[in-house]
Amino acid sequence: MKVILKVDVKGQGKAGEVKNVADAYAKNVLFKKNLAVEATPGNLKAFAAKERRAEEAAEEELNEAKRLKEKLEKETIAVTTKAGEGGRVFGSVTSKQIADALKSMGYKIDKRKIELEHPIKALGFTKVPVKLHHDVVATLNVHVQEA
């Protein structure tokens, strides 16, 4: 019997693949555990349409990330902090503080997407990479100022 796998099934294949399996295995295991559906022409069409929608959504997400990258790279993010003599910052500027500054500017970016190799410990301008999408990385200009 031909089935369309809904999820990855060990020993059978990955989600979305059409596989030929024994009738009893299909009925007693795959269908009961909702791991697969029978590969009828209607189900094949529905699955193809679902895949197309997922691809379109992924493409739209990528385009949105590229647009956001263009906007962010034109901005300078100002972060104020206490500093001592010689431009040394008390403590450090972390990704959370940068995310909060972005939020106050109207951008919603998770602090985990800001890829600081190490916290910023000096006043001035610093370039900080932000991973917006697995294919899109923006570079922020962060200006650390004395409060």
UniProtKB/Swiss-Prot annotation:
GO terms for biological process: translation. The keyword rRNA-binding applies. GO terms for molecular function: rRNA binding; structural constituent of ribosome. Pfam families: Ribosomal_L9_C, Ribosomal_L9_N. Keywords: Ribonucleoprotein, Ribosomal protein, RNA-binding, rRNA-binding. SUPFAM superfamilies: L9 N-domain-like (SSF55658), Ribosomal protein L9 C-domain (SSF55653). Belongs to the bacterial ribosomal protein bL9 family. This is Large ribosomal subunit protein bL9. The lineage of its organism: Bacteria, Bacillati, Bacillota, Bacilli, Bacillales.
